[in-house]
Every structure is written in C-alpha cells, then in structure tokens.
Amino acid sequence: MSEEKPTVRTEEDDRYEDDAGDLDLGQIGSRVWLVKIPKFLMDKWNSIPEDDAANLGCVRVKNDEIQLLLQNSPENADVPKIYNLRVMNKFVRNSYVFRESETSSSMKSTALVGTVAHECNVSPVINDDYRRVMQKRALAASAPKRKVQMIDDRGGSLLAPGTLGSRSRSTTSFIRNVKPRTGEGLKNSRIPRNELLDILFKCFEDYEYWTLKGLREYVKQPEVYLKEVLDSIAILNKRGPYALKYSLKPEYKGTMDAASVELRNQQASQSESSSIDHTGKNTSPDNPGTNAEEDEDDDGVEMIDVV
C-alpha cells in the first residue's frame, strides 16, 4: 500500500486561489469597436464620476462618412464637439475586451465584454469651434506659472550699520556691464554702387551660383542695398537644383568684363549729371568746367565703343 505524500502550500498557491473565479463568456458574441481618441478627450471622460449616468455622445453614419458627436452640455464646453471617425482596420482577429471588477468577497470577477470587430481613430473636425477651443487652451498654456508678488516695504532705517554694505553687495552680484559693440557700423557702411557691381561680377566669375546669405557675408553690405543692386544684374532661380540661388542674367553671361565696364560708365554718368548746375558747366570736383577751346581739341579724338 502506497503512502500519500503531504502537500506543501506556497504563497503563490494562495495568490492564485484568491484570484480564482470563472471567466464570464456570456458576451463573446458582442462586437465592439476599438477606438483611439485624443488625450484631452480621454482626460475629459475620465473626469466624469462613474456613478453619474452620462451620455457621452452619439455616432452618426452617413454613406462612407462616420462622425462622433458629443452632447452640447456644460461638461463638454472646453472640448471640440465634432470628430471624424476613421476605420483603420475593418477585420480584426483574436482581439477581445475584458472587464475586471472586485466583488464583496474580495475576489476579482473577470468578464469578457466583447470581440473587437474594427480598429478606429478619432480626430477633431477643424472648424470655428475647434479653433476657439484650441486658442483658449494655447492662452492657458502660455500664461506664466509664476506671479510677481509685491512685498510691503519693511520698516527700519536703511542707514543702519551694515545695511548699506549688504545692499551694495546684493545688487552688484547680478548687474553686469555690457561692453559697447565696436566696428558694427563700419562693417555695414555702404560702398559706391559701381564698386559693389565690380565685386558682384567678380563673385559670379568665381562661382556661377550664389545665395543671398553668402553674398552678404562676402561683400559685407546691408541686405536691402545688396539686393537692390543684385536684382539689376542677376536673377533668383526658383526651381531646379539651384533653387533660391542667384545667377547672372543671360545678357551678362560670357561678357562679364564688358558688362561691368558698361555699368560702371552708366553709374559714373549718372553721378556726373547730378553735379552739373543750371549754367551747363560741370562743377564736379573730378571734372572742372571746360571751355570752347578744349571742346575743339576734343573733336580730333576718336571714341570707340566697348562691346
């Protein structure tokens, strides 16, 4: 006759015995939707007490469009009311929803709520109500968390022994002297237009394409002035591999030296014409007034156009 060995109980056996209970499969035929909702909507629904029987909303199906509509109640005042519901997976397999609750006998009761039929995503509809709610949330998030509190002036004399010295040490510890910036005005001072044209033609002679930032760092000129001169000789490519880069206009390509000379002559003639007074004499310091005899001597000089 065989002897029965005594069994030894462990803490693990006690733990499983406490959780022992039958799984309720009565709702296995129920089809449920697994819906992913925004976090702010989940927080709003979680704040509703479980004891209150609240109608969260309804689902409206119109042709292929599915929308989630919330109740227009004070509880939903700070959240959007209309959401688009998109079915991401129409055929879900081996996914179930369970519910676990504690009974009076301190045992957990587990029940199957239903079988997942579809997986869906919920996103708010962009309308005036949504913009108003988001604007209110943005203002609340941008509000400073710390406030300045005014403290009444404490009594006592500021000239008390040791008071003046402590104030000077406390204020000088966080006050820093800002050094004046030097050379910035000279760096951005404008140069004559003809000199800037020479520099720009030299830049495009070295490299065919330039960005506005690269030219500004190279020529050290104000951006507005540089762009004004640059637009007269170059174009901004808006497409292709050299998008947002400047290149010379077709009429200046291949004849860069001649084009630069012609533009310099035009700039010089404009500056000279501005210095001629109403008598017709040139009062420019570089070209003093000429007389009739000098004009006759210039008749024998042959002028050649540079192309």
From Swiss-Prot:
CDD domains: TFIIF_beta
Record-level Gene Ontology MF annotations: DNA binding; nucleotide binding; RNA polymerase II general transcription initiation factor activity
One GO biological process term: transcription initiation at RNA polymerase II promoter
Keywords, ordered alphabetically: DNA-binding, Nucleotide-binding, Nucleus, Transcription, Transcription regulation
GO cellular component: nucleus; transcription factor TFIIF complex
Source superkingdom: Eukaryota
Broad class of where this protein is predominantly found: nucleus
Biased segments, Basic and acidic residues type: 1-12
Chain spans, region Disordered: 1-22, 261-307
Polar residues: bias regions: 263-290
Subcellular location(s) of the protein: Nucleus
Amino acid composition bias (Acidic residues), ranges on this chain: 13-22, 292-307
InterPro entries (UniProt xref): TFIIF_beta, TFIIF_beta_HTH, TFIIF_beta_N, TFIIF_interaction, WH-like_DNA-bd_sf, WH_DNA-bd_sf
Function description: TFIIF is a general transcription initiation factor that binds to RNA polymerase II and helps to recruit it to the initiation complex in collaboration with TFIIB. It promotes transcription elongation.
Family membership: Belongs to the TFIIF beta subunit family.
Summary of subunit composition and partner proteins: Component of the fcp1/TFIIF/polII complex via interaction of tfg3 with both tfg1/TFIIF-alpha and tfg2/TFIIF-beta subunits.
Protein name: Transcription initiation factor IIF subunit beta
Organism per entry: Schizosaccharomyces pombe (strain 972 / ATCC 24843) (Fission yeast)
